[in-house]
Design a protein with these regions (language model features):
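A short, active-site helix/loop in glycosyltransferases that binds the activated sugar's phosphate group
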Residues: 93, 116-163, 170, 499-521
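A charged, aromatic-enriched C-terminal amphipathic alpha-helix characteristic of glycosyltransferases
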Residues: 305, 315-354
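Conserved catalytic-core segment of nucleotide-activated headgroup transferases in glycan assembly
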Residues: 24, 125, 143-252, 387, ...
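Nucleotide-sugar-dependent
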Residues: 199, 260-276, 288-297, 625-630, ...
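Extended catalytic core of nucleotide-activated donor transferases of GT-like folds
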Residues: 10-12, 23, 27-31, 37-136, ...
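A nucleotide-sugar donor-handling region in carbohydrate enzymes
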Residues: 161-174, 479-480, 484-487, 494-564
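Conserved nucleotide-sugar phosphate-binding/catalytic loop shared by glycosyltransferases and other
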Residues: 45-75, 238-241, 365-366, 371-375, ...
């Protein structure tokens, strides 16, 4: 379509999922790029993930390598094919429409509509309505395997199905193991899966049939956890168990002869990615018989009580073992490899089209809503100003701050709204949070930001309620580390209401003993956030001239905070007297924009009100400073000798 960027394929989904769905998408992206297809990636916010997740590392690597472009949901694009992944992503309609004009639309069904007991996993009728409304036309559902297709065939109200199953894709080469026969004198049985009780048999007796408690076997398990001890009790002596992700699955599978996979009766395996990984490695897959429709001659099929005999027979016959391993590897290469994916794309949309980009519609302005707490200083506000200053076009920062220093934001050229904190108003905190919720809901409706960033130590309940009322709004909590040890468990639990948690690194983080240290897996740690870069600082002579400091005297700066929560007057006056009497120093005192009381200074001592003060730090020979995050890192960046006051 004229005026719209064109892509052969647009992939739509929530690509934060840590499991097989995202791995399958990454394989498709790599195969499409290698075949010359141009792919756009449209990230949606699904309802499944309940705590912060980053984009799956393999998908992020694809984006960084240029295998796909990350699309702005507000930008209209045209495509030959939309491939939407996982029904759960379409549980709710978003606040804004997806602007993709596609010729063909598929919804890949990575999760079955029913569990093994016939109970619904999701409302497929509502999801189908939402998917067609969001994607702008007819959507065909593409099961990833025959188990899912069979469930839909039995439904009276099934959505329209694509004619062929959309199998997962794997590049076999990284998984291949040069096998000359079984690894040891004893058969090595293994399995890897995420730590979920549904991925294991229903009871202990069945589990020990498939994974014998018998010293004539070695059993290796990648993906153990408390659930497994609840199932089997103490691990048998012949079991070797590692936590999920303790090692790459490629390395694990190289230590396994037989990949034995039996799961719970409630679980319906839509595809079985771990199975094709095992077969690609040359391990012999031993599976329940319901997998035969998908994997055919690539695996051995047995009931749990038949596993022991099956494994012992193949282990004793080296040639039969190798033949079966080769059958599995050949099936993977033929049916699930990148070439198979490219063949189905060519059958569906033809070869890549030569038109790369449309006429190029201008990118729409997008507003990012920054929310900052009040604080006793202006650190929260300054950190978000540092981020806002670096936002690329067409992003437009908008602020809601509880800080009385709101004028600073406006002086920096940004839109800013001010809402007084409940302590400043003398009102009930519960009523104030209700007001905050309504204010935020109105601001979100008015500015329509795709992202809200909160900087503060404690996410307010009113903020949490506003986020819950806007489930497709992406939310980020920017929080410092260095919490007091043993404190904050109730606060850190609120991270589940954010899509991402960003922690600006503290240069003293080796001494961090606070609770955030134990939540790093859910946190994106970034370099220290500072308002100015090194090149923005004035050279010493220019800074002294700007502040009116005598170039021939020692210059000292005192910045002990706003003084709103601690009275620094006694300390300040003692320091001034000592510096002037003993060292004949030219003393300056930083005056905070939100100070409730004006500074009372002796004659000849100047108040410095410039913002940002860090621009002038090189004017001083010494800084005596409170140990706030911003002050600490700005002084270190400036390279000025300092004494920090706890």
């Amino acid at each position: 379509m004229p005026g719209r960027p064109y892509y052969d394929i647009v992939a739509v989904g929530d690509f934060r999922f840590p499991g097989g769905t995202s791995t399958a998408v990454a394989e498709e992206l790599r195969a499409q790029a290698a075949a010359g297809y141009r792919t756009g990636l449209l990230q949606l916010k699904g309802p499944v993930l309940k705590y912060p997740h980053a984009i799956h590392p393999q998908i992020r690597a694809c984006l960084e390598a240029g295998a796909a472009d990350l699309l702005d949901p507000a930008t209209a694009v045209a495509a030959a094919l939309v491939v939407a992944h996982h029904p759960a992503v379409f549980t709710h309609l978003p606040r804004r429409a997806i602007r993709v004009d596609a010729e063909t639309r598929l919804l890949i069904v990575h999760h079955p509509p029913l569990d093994g007991h016939g109970e619904a996993n999701y409302d497929w009728a509502a999801i189908h309505r939402h998917a067609e409304a969001m994607l702008g036309g007819t959507v065909l559902w593409a099961p990833t395997g025959p188990a899912v297709r069979g469930q839909f065939a039995a439904l009276d109200d099934a959505p329209p199905l694509f004619a062929r199953d959309w199998h997962g894709v794997i590049e076999p080469r990284p998984w291949r193991v040069a096998r000359k026969g079984p690894l040891e004198s004893r058969p090595v049985i293994g399995r890897h899966s995420r730590p979920d009780a549904l991925k294991w048999p229903d009871d202990r007796a069945t589990a020990l049939m498939a994974y014998p408690d018998d010293p004539i076997f070695v059993v290796r398990i990648l993906g153990g956890g408390p659930f497994l001890r609840e199932l089997v009790g103490s691990y048998p002596p012949n079991w070797q168990v590692w936590p999920f992700n303790a090692m790459p699955p490629e390395r694990f599978l190289a230590t396994v002869d037989f990949f034995v996979y039996f799961h719970h009766s409630r679980w319906v395996e839509a595809f079985g990615r771990t199975v094709i990984e095992a077969m690609a490695s040359g391990a012999v897959a031993v599976l329940p018989r319901h997998f035969e429709a998908l994997f055919g001659e690539g695996a051995i099929y047995a009931a749990p009580h038949e596993v022991r005999a099956c494994v012992r027979e193949l282990h004793a016959d080296r040639q039969a073992f190798l033949r079966q391993g080769r059958r599995g590897a050949a099936l993977v290469n033929r049916q699930f490899g990148p070439a198979a994916h490219v063949r189905r794309l060519r059958a569906l949309i033809g070869r890549p089209r030569p038109t790369l980009v449309g006429a190029g519609a201008p990118r729409l302005k997008r507003r990012i809503l920054f929310v900052t707490s009040n604080g006793v200083g202006i650190g929260h506000l300054t950190r978000m100003l540092a981020v806002a200053r670096r936002c690329p076009k067409p992003l437009e920062p908008v602020f809601l701050t509880l800080s009385q220093a709101v004028r600073i934001v406006r002086e920096q050229g940004f839109l800013a709204e001010y809402l007084p904190f409940h302590a400043a108003l003398g009102c009930d905190p519960q009523q104030w949070n209700q007001s905050l919720r309504e204010e935020l809901k109105e601001l979100i409706a008015f500015y329509d930001p795709p992202v809200l960033v909160f900087d503060g130590n404690v996410p307010y309940q009113g903020l949490i309620d506003a986020l819950r009322a806007n489930p497709d709004l992406w939310s980020v909590w920017c929080r410092r580390g260095m919490w007091q040890p043993g404190r904050g468990a109730d606060v850190i639990a609120r991270e589940r209401d954010f899509d991402a948690v960003v922690e600006p690194r503290d240069l003293a983080d080796r001494l961090d003993r606070g609770l955030t240290v134990h939540h790093r897996s859910r946190t994106r740690v970034v370099d220290p956030i500072r308002l100015l870069d090194a090149g923005d600082l004035l050279p010493p002579n220019e800074a002294r001239a700007a502040l009116g400091i005598d170039p021939g005297r020692r210059a000292v700066l005192l910045q002990l905070g706003a003084g709103n929560n601690y009275d620094y007057a006694t300390l300040r006056h003692a320091a001034i007297a000592l510096l002037r009497e003993r060292y004949d120093a030219d003393v300056s005192v930083a005056e905070w924009p939100i100070a409730e009381q004006p500074l009372e200074l002796p004659e000849g001592v100047r108040a410095v009100r410039e913002y940002p003060l860090s621009r002038y730090l090189k004017a001083f020979d010494l800084v005596i400073s409170a140990v706030g995050y911003n002050s600490f890192h700005e002084i270190l960046l400036a390279g000025v000798p300092a004494i920090f006051v706890p």
